[in-house]
Amino acid sequence: MQETTEDFVKKLNEAGIEHYLPYAQVSSSDGVFGNGLWSATPLADPADDDVNSSASFMPGGTVDMGGQQIRFISVHTTAPVPGYWRQWKRSLDELGLMRGHTDTRYIFMGDFNATYDHTPFRDFLGDRFVDAARESGHGFTFSWPTNRVYMPMFAGIDHVVLDQGMKAGQCKVVKVEGSDHAALLVTVAVG
């Protein structure tokens, strides 16, 4: 999850998230908003910032999936708003450096603030990573904005990105009450 706050995490805990997803890694680079991972199975080697990103802390944790170690990372890059174009591109370029970490298999999830039409996002994917929605044949996954009364979701800026050799199955866009982003639910075969 992205843009978590202490109050939001407290409400998740009060609602009983730990009964379903008892393992978590939540971090904040500014002390206000953060990003988090929740898991039903233990998160090995949890880290506050796996990417060393200038945009935000992007926490990571490794999950054993049938004997395979898969590193999950919660992504939130800089928004491409006027005055922040360089920072936006840099935050995607920093993610692209992860292609060089060949000793680890990754699944990146979250708000990339970029669509497949953006060159920096495609550069991040390179020849190693794949967008799960495209891999699954789902097509467009418009996920933002969900909170506009007279405007439908028109931007697919949220993604689940898979490492090579993984296969995406079903992909579904789900509105989340109180959020301006929809969630993506994706089934993955890690192979």
Where are these regions (language model features)?
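Soluble catalytic domains of enzymes that build or remodel membrane lipids, polysaccharides, and related
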Residues: 1-191
